[in-house]
Amino acid sequence: MEKYMFLFLGGDPSHLSPEKQQAHMQKWFDWVEKMKNEKRYVAGEALMPGGKTVTGPKKVVTDGPYAESKEVVGGFFVILAKDIDEATKLAKDCPDYDLNGIVEVREVVKFE
């Protein structure tokens, strides 16, 4: 099995009612539990909105990324899958698609 990273972009549930937000989070908990039971889940975290960016040779620091952007990374998982196709299939179970979320699937490089 190889390691793959899911980068979660968009999919902001903040406009939902508290009850719908809770139901949405339960879908996430269920998805993580399913992957843990299948021995696929390695790690994952949600990220706070905002932050800082450091850019270029002069290491210019600016505010951002901005939470209003549709392509801000909101979190990540590292999972195990046999190949990119299987990882992509697993990513299709992400609960954020109902909120127009995006999941970027990337293989983790092995340095040996």
Please report, for each region that a protein language model flagged, where it lies by residue:
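Conserved, structured core segments of small domains
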Residues: 1-112
